[in-house]
Amino acid sequence: MSDEKKKGSAASAMPTAMAPPGLINKEDIPQVLPILPLRNSVFFPGGVLPLAVGRQKTIALIKDAVRDDQVIGVVTQRRAEEEDPGAADLYTMGTVARIVKLLKMGEDNYSLVVQGLARFRVVELVQEAPYLKARVDAVEDKTSSENVEVEALGINLKKLAREVIELMPELPAAATELVESITHPGHLADLIAANVDVPIEEKQAVLETVDLKARMKLVLELLNRKREILKLSNKIDSAVKGEMSKTQREYYLRQQLKAIKEELGEMGEEEEELDELQERLKKAGLPPDVEKVANKELNRLKTIPAASSEYTVARTYLDWIADLPWAKISEDNLDIENARQQLDKDHFGIKKVKKRILEYLAVRKLKNDMRGPILCLVGPPGVGKTSLGQSVAKATGRKFVRLSLGGVRDEAEIRGHRRTYVGALPGRFIQSMKKAGTKNPVMMLDEIDKLGADFRGDPSAALLEVLDPEQNNTFSDHYLDVPFDLSKVMFVATANQLDPIPGPLRDRMEIIELTGYTFEEKQSIARIHLVPKQLKEHGLSPDHIDITDEALLTLTTAYTREAGVRNLERRIADICRAVAVEVAGGKTEKQTINADRVKEILGPEMFYSEVAERTEVPGVATGLAWTAAGGDLLFIEATKMAGKGGMTLTGQLGDVMKESATAALSYLRSKAEQLGISPNFLEKTDLHLHFPAGSIPKDGPSAGVTILTALTSLLTGIRVRHDTAMTGEATLRGLVLPVGGIKEKVLAAHRAGIKRVILPERCRKDLIDVPDQARNELEFIFVTHMDDVLKAALETPPVGVAGTPGGEPGKEAPLPKPAESAPEVRA
């Protein structure tokens, strides 16, 4: 949308036209004027100004003014960026104007021409909508009896204006004639002030100067300053032209000197550097098209003086060409068993990724020219995604480079800047290839889901070429401007979530999902990796400290509750520091860290099972939720009070979750008699559903069965079993539909000490991905209808509930055999 602003710059090539002053009498100016805010310009009486308008308030103003043939007030804004200016945003002095021409340029854009008539002062704003109106006082020029001084000031003004015009050859000769033709001194001062290139504040000061003599003196100061600036500018311009002539002469002499040195066989340091560069280019193994470009640039470099800035630009470019690994490839370690041992040594679990790397090495062993895979590891923080890249590089015998993409918002970070820009460099991918020194490194693209985008472009769109196996063999960097082959690179991207990654970019990567660890896995990771690492970092040895299995269990259950192991490593580091203090103080005997010693060092337990406490009253149910950091418990609290049938929802809920609550209430009303609830329970009762942790946004359909269970518990007075958690979408007919994130939710239930988990029947297949420990220690109840849910979840099933739970208490549900591509339903 266009703004109300003057067409052209403040100092245009032709002085703004001025109409004769005194076109309106003071008595003819209304006491209340519609106000048109003006940006980046000051409008003077007698001036004729073209304007482009687009703000809705201004469009309404000009339509009314044209229809009623009334004058308007034009007032300059103090800050041009203000979209809806008020009294504080406008200057107090403006110009009465008449609209002399109006053209519609588009649907919401108009062009008009206004003529300045007289000055006015704003007394107060009396209207803000549909546009501004103000009560005003007309202002006339204050003239003194000293006409001789005013006449002298006018002569000086014209003289100074002629000098300024002569210093600006781009102005037409008519500019001088226009200035000479004006006889009215106030009109002359306003004309010059309107056209001289000075800040808006200084122009406004001229407009607000009512005393004619003071105004003319002020304009004289502005003109005099402008004249001095123009003189200095012309002087600098002449000096630059002279310097250019001098540079051209020096270049000619240098070329002659170079020819003389060649004849005498006296090559200088510059020539030796160029010969060395040429030799490096020959050894770089450049492709034919790149070699052609490099030789052309090298020949041009030989003709440029070393002191020239262009010499540095060309030399830097050729250095980049020579240093890139165009043909250097590191040999893959194709020993499958060695790679398996290396991966198992560095990382516990994550079998999917290890399996995929071993598959790649096996195929690479059979087919030598295979392209590098493009993997994307998706999972919560702390599960080992980033560190896995280094392990993959060790296992394959390749170089490792890492690119952190989190917060990158500039497309030039990926493709580089063109060489025309000062300080231009290649993008991060080319820089990383130079750092790796080989054509086939393992390149870790860390936090690819946290790429940004702004006015400088979208980096995720630039990555489409990099991560496309059909295109990245001719990747084009803006700085190099020649194709570079990235097809041999093994890309390993990491992300916490898939949703922020654009669909086309996600489609180019092979997604491998990593989930959280069980307690047993965390203890194994701590014993094998974390404890030895922290002992080494704190200068300790196994002779100083022995952390028992009991202590590790306490750490994983009472002091950390996360999908990964970062906080677990921090707590182990806390214990090591406490022991280090004692060892440094002279204590020599070996210290055994058990559960009591952990509590002594770390203080009170941070986590404990609160499910039983939360669900000890009717109306509270335990649900399961998926988050970017893994799964988590989601408590739902319901209460009732006297009212008129309303339902309040709190906890920062999204639209889908609100609709789930509405559907659950409708289902309960339709089944009230069957469940032993009064059919008219809403007539004198209000319901309130609350989802604790109100600062965290929540959404999704998977809380449907939990909401319905909590409401049923509240209205029947039957408590929900405290050892039971559930997830699933409930329909208006009571059917239970499948949801996603089952593995993460089940692991969250296991971490929290839940014993029974209610799942949709169609999610039975998703338990294949759940670790054996969690699967063996939990009882799974598969349901297809809400009757099954209520019978399994409530301590005493309500009267009239039909159906049976989908599983048998005390038995693990039978699991399907793994399939190559089993469909997975996600909420």
From Swiss-Prot:
Binding, ATP: G379, P380, P381, G382, V383, G384, K385, T386
PROSITE patterns hit by this protein: LON_N (PS51787), LON_PROTEOLYTIC (PS51786), LON_SER (PS01046)
Residues in coiled coil: none
Region entry Disordered, spans: 1-22, 799-827
EC identifiers of the protein: 3.4.21.53
GO biological process, any: protein quality control for misfolded or incompletely synthesized proteins
NCBIfam families linked: lon
Record-given protein name: Lon protease 2
Organism this protein belongs to: Myxococcus xanthus
Taxonomic classification: Bacteria, Pseudomonadati, Myxococcota, Myxococcia, Myxococcales
Gene name as annotated: lon2
